[in-house]
Regions:
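A positively charged, amphipathic N-terminal helix/segment that binds anionic biomolecules
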Residues: 1-137
């Protein structure tokens, strides 16, 4: 059976490992300088002109690259000019990486707090017993 000193030692080691993981996630966030919330993708649509090639059932559709994001509960789209595609793709990817690192940090933080609580339980001693009183008599 493990002693409380053994359990405390294992908890300290686990905490150090978790703190290292936490630091790696923070390090993943720090280089990101600009973010754009949203997704960049190609949107294929029909223009509505009856004589256009897109009017046929199997005809090719018009393609434009857009960025999509949610604002006040509504999905917004904005067409991106060809010169800005790679820039906005990178900014959207930065946002995705930022959010993933943030989510990992939240989970790690919960695990760290749980380990600290367990360590406290292992280290805590009971209060001293009351001094014995001798009756004179």
């Amino acid at each position: 059976m493990a002693t409380s000193a053994d359990r405390a030692s294992r908890l300290r080691q686990a905490l150090k490992t978790l703190l290292g993981d936490y630091q790696r996630q923070v390090d993943a966030l720090l280089p990101l300088r600009q973010l754009v919330k949203g997704s960049v993708y190609d949107l294929r649509t029909r223009c509505g002109k009856p004589s256009c090639h897109c009017a046929a059932d199997q005809g090719p559709l018009h393609t434009s690259t857009v960025i999509s994001w949610s604002e006040h509960g509504k999905t917004r789209l904005r067409t991106l000019p060809p010169g800005e595609l790679s820039h906005f793709r990178q900014l959207a990817e930065n946002y995705r990486r930022f959010r993933q690192a943030r989510a990992a940090l939240v989970k790690l933080h919960q695990r760290i707090v749980a380990h600290i609580d367990r360590l406290e339980t292992v280290l805590e001693l009971p209060p001293p017993k009351p001094a014995s009183r001798r009756r004179k008599g």
